[in-house]
Curated annotation (Swiss-Prot):
UniProt similarity note: Belongs to the P-Pant transferase superfamily. AcpS family.
Entry cofactors: Mg(2+)
Subcellular location: Cytoplasm
Keywords from the named record: Cytoplasm, Fatty acid biosynthesis, Fatty acid metabolism, Lipid biosynthesis, Lipid metabolism, Magnesium, Metal-binding, Transferase
UniProt name for this protein: Holo-[acyl-carrier-protein] synthase
Protein's gene: acpS
The keyword Metal-binding is annotated on this UniProt entry: yes
Gene Ontology CC: one annotated term: cytoplasm
Enzyme Commission number: 2.7.8.7
Phylogenetic lineage: Bacteria, Bacillati, Bacillota, Clostridia, Eubacteriales
GO molecular function: holo-[acyl-carrier-protein] synthase activity; magnesium ion binding
Length: 133
């Protein structure tokens, strides 16, 4: 059963500017594994903006926005084929588990795309619905 959906779009230029103007921007919002992925992609602003939009989309699908957890509690990685995968930690994981009957049944689907100026992410939460947060 679909439990939640979320979408977010962001201007890549705003992310590029934040990276330039704030030396702590990446370390405040992204895990070490995410930053390692960005480095492997030559610190491509489109990739970073896509991950930022993905975190926002997942937070909206959880039904809370970025309340009750930090940006780092939603980790966006890629599998061996490049498909984005979501790992929920700490507060985000607790909120996700409150939504499903069986803690292991929550599945987070994610799609990320971008053009020259914007990045967009769409997330769907699926599982056996248990109740509200």
């Amino acid at each position: 059963m679909i439990i939640g959906i979320g979408v977010d779009i962001i201007e890549i230029g705003r992310v590029r500017q934040a990276i330039r103007n704030n030396k702590n921007f990446l370390s405040k919002l992204f895990t070490e594994r995410e930053i390692d992925y960005f480095i492997s992609r030559n610190m491509n602003s489109e990739v970073i903006a896509g991950n930022f939009a993905a975190k926002e989309a997942v937070s909206k699908a959880l039904g809370t926005g970025m309340r009750g957890f930090s940006f780092k509690d939603i980790e966006i990685l890629r599998n061996e084929l490049g498909k984005p995968e979501v790992i929920l930690h700490n507060g985000a994981n607790l909120i996700g588990n409150k939504l499903v009957e069986n803690n292991n049944s929550l599945r987070v689907h994610l799609s990320i795309s971008h053009n020259n100026s914007s990045a967009i992410a769409y997330s769907v939460l699926e599982g056996e619905y248990y109740g509200n947060i």
